[in-house]
Amino acid sequence: MKIFVTGVAGQLGHDVMNELASRGYVGVGTDLAESYSGIQDGSYVTTAEYVSLDITNKEAVMNTIKTVNPDVVVHCAAWTAVDLAEDEDKQAKVKAINVDGTQNIADACKEVDAKMVYISTDYVFDGQGTEPWQPDCKDYKPLNVYGQTKLGGELAVSNTLSKYFIVRIAWVFGKNGNNFIKTMLNVGKKFDTLRVVNDQIGTPTYTFDLARLLVDIIETDKYGYYHATNEGGYISWYDFACEIFKQAGYTTKVNPVTTEEYGLSKAARPFNSRLDKSKLVENGFKPLPTWQDALARYLKELA
């Protein structure tokens, strides 16, 4: 099986490529840079076949995917700078990448009859209430530009293809990129006390674990919508920060604050990012390990 992976310079794309190699599959990576520009850790992705591609260039996407002729495309590339996406001068570019770029990928998948995996987000929902969001819920009300464009990408995929997996994730962390854990470790070295919000609730997603699940999924034809974060219960960012410092051996004191008290963010964030993942088990997929276990392994990976 040959798999074309977009966004390999990012956290998830990096881990998907390496997971494919560990199972004997051929992964072809792509990103915007002329050559692989992610972390140089000596893993498979750093030397694998790579194609430079601007996903907003419809003709280039079609030609590249027809040439590679993959069985599956795992589409990890996206604009993910949530606050920056609110700037008026950035919004056309955000849409071009997250909506139009995804449409280009979907059109090419249809042309070569490839399965497509689209990575989406809890931000397609409005985050109201306390009940976990179901994967097949269509009550979309994104609160910010990023969420609106990721929803646009979902609709592009579902309206174009029948052989698709839309996988929503949240609170992502991985080796190859910036994330909340790295931020906490950095600021925890500089400050004795920190303020972290305690009214946004969800579950983290370790890209190493998610990559394994995604390869499990593409080995099947169990198409549709899935939610995939680590197990271990729903938590706040405050809870997460406390556990990060505990496991890392930091003495940093964390003070809980509300989102309103914290301020600073341009983009509105959902309060309820609880994602129901029971559909994974119902379809025979193994759930991700607990986020506490994932954090412990990740800290070792960073060491």
Put a short name on every predicted segment.
Residues 43-57:
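Rossmann-fold cofactor-recognition segment
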Residues 190, 213, 220-265, 271-272:
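Mid/C-terminal beta-alpha module of Rossmann-like enzyme folds, strongest
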Residues 6, 196-201, 226-234:
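Glycine-rich Rossmann NAD(P)(H)-binding loop
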Residues 155-202, 208-209:
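NAD(P)-dependent short-chain dehydrogenase/reductase
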Residues 55-97:
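NAD(P)H-binding glycine-rich loop region in Rossmannoid oxidoreductase-like domains
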Residues 1-23:
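N-terminal Rossmann NAD(P)H-binding glycine-rich loop of SDR-like oxidoreductase domains
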Residues 236-242, 258-298, 302:
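Conserved C-terminal active-site "lid" loop/helix of NAD(P)H-dependent oxidoreductases
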Residues 92-104, 124-167, 172:
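Catalytic helix-loop patch of NAD(P)-dependent Rossmann-fold dehydrogenases
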